[in-house]
């Protein structure tokens, strides 16, 4: 429903909260937000009650430039006498003076980082967080004069003779070493966000329990120091029945999350007991390191452990739906804890909480070792990680800090011709008002947790730093409105953490991106995300010189089919079989696919990647090795400084890791690669494939 009937008072409140009263749809039509929706969001976005430690304002500025802070942002009573103090992150006082000018406070240029500006009178104190940003996000030196490539995988999909039925950090180590030998400068993986141990089949890495904590299911257990010293667990592992179980899990074409989690916990629980009581010098030393880890991570680490303990009790049957996942399905008394109840539960479940904290420590330890392995292997970038838009509604993140999220709203996408009813992702948005009052500390912590072990970080739906489509609880996506976020401040933080962690940022910017957002992303040198499947314009694919330079280019993504499957329309067949697409809509999809394929063939002919006599009819031509290689070679020669090669495409495998618009109808997030890693890196044809990619990049 479109409406302009919004009172002036509500308009002013909405604009102050960043709620867009209108937007242009994909066809250029002006759509007005519904008054009821606007009113609901205004209520959700009211400033929190002023609390100790809260910031009154936040200002973003560039490093090494003079800073003018305009005091009308604070509404200071003019009758009082004020002084100000500037402190850095270590609380060292950099400046302390009497405030003589009540209009502008001028500060000297500062190095990049976080600062606090405090303004005092005898009765009042105002706290302003300064976000002093580098001019750009981190730019790896290797990209100054080289076009690089890497391999991208869904980590869980890897096969080997060593893993326990799911690709793990041991497989990732092998992939890093072998890819580096072939000339790759990074290995890209799916998000490693913590899932729900109580409901292991809720496996989407884009709908996790926490974006701050890691998925311990990827642990390479035999590589743990505790495993190497614990004879009883080693003996258990060698048992014929256990080896048979592991072999069966390896053979399966889909990851059996429930069985693998149960098996890994059967090993990890006695290993934790061994870790606690062993008197060997190595384990005693490790206990001291773990104690320091607990101290540094503090209560947030313990709360994710408590969440897992309670969730395992409440979901003992390991089943949940979207409206009962995580804390949404718990008894009422545990859904919203008082400080006293939280403290009591932390004490009651201390031992089990320590176990989950230990699993986080082990996971971080192995991931850190993997990034070091990248450097030792000669990779210039290392691990390419992925950051989801947000955690899911029933998550540990939301439960442990409910004020930070608007749980009575969801994020998604407005209606468009491809999705006439819009999209509801059922992810609760950050409350930007609360985020700003906290000086963006939760956002900073989350970014740092994701960047510290990666050389590259892809940010899913980077537009979310600028605005998100909010949907009121109980309403459809069509009833939503855009809510703007403090873009300048979030970009400043992104640049600070990127440079500190030496992490290149890729912003997933598919779809319509406003000019002001595109300009800002370019200013900060955030790499664009360029997908071949979506690159066709007016019946042509771009020439290699027309590919954006500051971009990561790839054939597909986790949400689209592999090249083989795309070419043979297997995804459309699946959508038809599942009743998602049929009739005229399905026919349009098939027609569009043929047009895209023909356009790609024509463009490859145009640029001499295919010889003149080569078959050029997309309707009758099947995908085959030569065409596959030429598409990759075309991508490799493109102007983009970074390209990604997906292992499923090298293997010519027909696969869709995720089929959008499905949940239980299709085995999303569990399909495996057709061949083990050892085959991929010993196969002569694939070695030649890697040589061609290197040649294309070095042109």
Swiss-Prot record:
GO terms for molecular function: 4-alpha-glucanotransferase activity. It comes from the Bacteria. Keywords: Carbohydrate metabolism, Cytoplasm, Glycosyltransferase, Transferase. It is found in: Cytoplasm. The keyword Cytoplasm applies. The keyword Cell division does not apply. It catalyses: Transfers a segment of a (1->4)-alpha-D-glucan to a new position in an acceptor, which may be glucose or a (1->4)-alpha-D-glucan. PANTHER family: 4-ALPHA-GLUCANOTRANSFERASE DPE1, CHLOROPLASTIC/AMYLOPLASTIC, 4-ALPHA-GLUCANOTRANSFERASE DPE1, CHLOROPLASTIC_AMYLOPLASTIC. Belongs to the disproportionating enzyme family. This is 4-alpha-glucanotransferase. The gene is malQ.
């Amino acid at each position: 429903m479109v409406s302009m009937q919004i009172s002036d008072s509500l308009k002013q409140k909405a604009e102050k909260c960043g709620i867009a009263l209108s937007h242009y749809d994909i066809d250029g039509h002006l759509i007005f937000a519904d008054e009821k929706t606007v009113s609901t969001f205004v209520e959700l976005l009211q400033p929190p009650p002023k609390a100790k430690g809260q910031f009154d304002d936040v200002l973003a500025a560039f490093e090494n430039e003079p800073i003018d802070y305009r005091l009308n942002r604070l509404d200071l009573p003019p009758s009082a006498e004020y002084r100000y103090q500037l402190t850095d992150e270590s609380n060292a006082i950099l400046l302390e003076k009497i405030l003589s000018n009540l209009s502008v406070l001028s500060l000297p240029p500062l190095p990049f980082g976080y600062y606090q500006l405090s303004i005092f009178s005898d009765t009042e104190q105002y706290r302003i967080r300064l976000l002093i940003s580098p001019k750009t996000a981190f730019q790896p030196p290797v990209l100054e004069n080289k076009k690089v490539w890497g391999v991208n995988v869904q980590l869980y999909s890897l096969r080997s003779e060593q893993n326990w039925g799911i690709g793990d950090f041991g497989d990732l180590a092998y992939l890093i070493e072998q890819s580096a030998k072939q000339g790759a400068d990074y290995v890209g993986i799916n998000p490693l966000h913590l899932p729900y141990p109580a409901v292991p089949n809720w496996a989407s890495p884009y709908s996790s329990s926490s974006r701050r904590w890691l998925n311990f299911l990827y642990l390479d257990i035999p590589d743990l120091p505790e495993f190497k010293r614990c004879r009883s667990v080693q003996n258990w592992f060698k048992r014929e029945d256990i080896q048979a179980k592991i072999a069966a899990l390896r053979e399966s074409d889909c990851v059996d999350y429930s069985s693998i989690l149960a098996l890994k916990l059967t090993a990890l629980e006695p290993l934790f007991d061994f870790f606690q009581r062993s008197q060997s010098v190595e384990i005693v030393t490790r206990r001291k390191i773990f104690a320091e880890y607990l101290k540094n991570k503090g209560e947030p680490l313990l709360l994710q452990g408590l969440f897992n303990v309670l969730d395992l009790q409440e979901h003992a049957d390991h089943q949940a739906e979207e409206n009962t996942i995580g804390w949404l399905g718990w008894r009422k008394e545990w859904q919203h804890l008082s400080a006293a109840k939280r403290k009591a539960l932390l004490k009651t479940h201390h031992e089990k909480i320590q176990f989950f904290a230990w699993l986080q420590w082990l996971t971080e330890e192995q991931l850190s070792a993997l990034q070091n392995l990248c450097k030792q292997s000669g990779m210039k970038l290392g691990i390419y990680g992925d950051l989801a838009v947000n955690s899911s509604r029933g998550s540990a993140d939301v439960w442990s800090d409910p004020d930070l999220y608007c749980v009575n709203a969801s994020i998604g996408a407005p209606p468009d011709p491809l999705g006439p009813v819009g999209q509801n992702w059922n992810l609760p948005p950050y409350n930007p008002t609360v985020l700003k009052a906290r000086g963006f500390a939760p956002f900073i912590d989350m970014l740092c947790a994701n960047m510290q072990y990666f050389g590259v970080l892809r940010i899913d739906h980077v537009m979310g730093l600028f605005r998100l489509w909010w949907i009121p609880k109980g309403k459809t996506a069509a009833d939503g409105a855009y809510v703007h976020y403090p873009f300048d401040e979030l970009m400043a933080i992104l640049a600070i953490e990127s440079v500190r962690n030496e992490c290149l940022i890729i912003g997933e910017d598919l779809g319509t991106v406003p000019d002001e957002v595109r300009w800002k992303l370019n200013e900060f040198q955030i790499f664009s995300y360029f997908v071949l499947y979506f690159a066709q314009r007016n019946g042509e694919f771009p020439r290699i010189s027309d590919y954006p330079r500051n971009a990561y280019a790839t054939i597909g993504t986790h949400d689209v089919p592999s090249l083989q499957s795309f070419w043979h329309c297997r995804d459309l067949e699946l959508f038809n079989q599942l009743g998602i697409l049929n009739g005229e809509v399905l026919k349009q999809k098939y027609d569009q696919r043929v047009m895209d394929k023909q356009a790609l063939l024509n463009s490859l002919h145009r640029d001499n990647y295919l010889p003149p006599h080569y078959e050029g009819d997309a309707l009758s031509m099947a995908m085959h090795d030569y065409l596959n290689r030429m598409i990759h070679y075309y991508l490799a020669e493109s102007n983009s400084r970074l390209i990604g090669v997906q292992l499923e495409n090298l293997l010519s495998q027909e696969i869709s890791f995720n089929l959008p618009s499905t949940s239980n109808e299709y085995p999303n997030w569990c399909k495996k690669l057709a061949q083990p890693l050892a085959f991929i890196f010993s196969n002569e044809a694939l070695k030649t494939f890697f040589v061609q990619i290197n040649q294309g990049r070095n042109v």
